[in-house]
């Protein structure tokens, strides 16, 4: 069993560093309980250990022990643990990023990112056919899937990549060009559509492809 004393911060910043001592006490010959005690004379913090051995102990008081558990305690450097703890909490200890409180997992909920398996259902729920505007441009040229120059919108990743392509011909601003092409897609004479409608068109094609329907893909030049 180990017990920690509460840390007190009332000491002066320029006060000399108090000494740390640790002793091993065995009350009597044949006792099965050894006690380690670590303390500051300045009463800044204290640390106590109590172990039960399944062997007879030597009835004496010493700073060294016999056996594996005693050796483990002896190898621990008894330094200024109070200042080390305060420095770790303030980020002044190399190699220590964060000191966890009891029950703290160290993971910030704001840093957790959703996987693609979680994002796809949410995206499909938001982008329903009823919520998307209609693309009133039946003359949009298309090719069969897998044809030369065709780009298939089969998955969300492909759809995102396709919609992030430069949607400009000539002018480079995504508006109507002199050739009647909008968003990189050629149009017939007098038939125009906006860049937003082009993206909606891609969304509809991608959603239909996931349902297993045979849709043609838009041509990206």
Swiss-Prot record:
It comes from the Eukaryota. The lineage of its organism: Eukaryota, Metazoa, Chordata, Craniata, Vertebrata. InterPro entries: C144A/B/C. Residues 129-140 have a biased composition (Polar residues). This is Putative coiled-coil domain-containing protein 144 N-terminal-like. It comes from Homo sapiens (Human). Residues 1-28, 89-151 are annotated as: Disordered. Residues 1-10 have a biased composition (Basic and acidic residues). PANTHER family: COILED-COIL DOMAIN-CONTAINING PROTEIN 144A-RELATED. The gene is CCDC144NL. Belongs to the CCDC144 family.
């Amino acid at each position: 069993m180990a017990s920690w004393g509460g840390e007190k911060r009332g000491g002066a910043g320029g006060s000399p560093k108090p000494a740390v001592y640790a002793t091993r006490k065995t009350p009597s010959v044949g006792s099965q309980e050894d006690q380690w005690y670590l303390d500051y004379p300045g009463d800044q913090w204290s640390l106590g250990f109590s172990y039960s051995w399944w062997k007879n102990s030597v009835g004496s008081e010493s700073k060294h022990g016999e056996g594996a558990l005693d050796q483990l305690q002896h190898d621990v450097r008894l330094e200024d643990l109070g200042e080390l703890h305060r420095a770790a909490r303030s980020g002044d200890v190399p190699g220590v990023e964060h000191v966890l409180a009891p029950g703290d997992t160290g993971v910030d909920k704001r840093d957790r990112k959703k996987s693609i398996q979680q994002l796809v259902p949410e995206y499909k729920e938001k982008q329903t056919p009823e919520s998307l505007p209609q693309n009133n441009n039946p003359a949009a040229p298309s090719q069969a899937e897998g044809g030369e120059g065709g780009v298939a919108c089969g998955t969300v990743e492909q759809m995102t990549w396709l919609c992030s392509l430069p949607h400009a011909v000539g002018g480079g601003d995504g508006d109507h060009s002199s050739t009647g092409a909008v968003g990189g897609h050629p149009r017939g004479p007098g038939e125009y559509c906006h860049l937003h409608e082009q993206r909606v068109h891609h969304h509809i094609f991608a959603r239909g492809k996931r349902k297993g329907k045979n849709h043609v893909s838009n041509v990206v030049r």
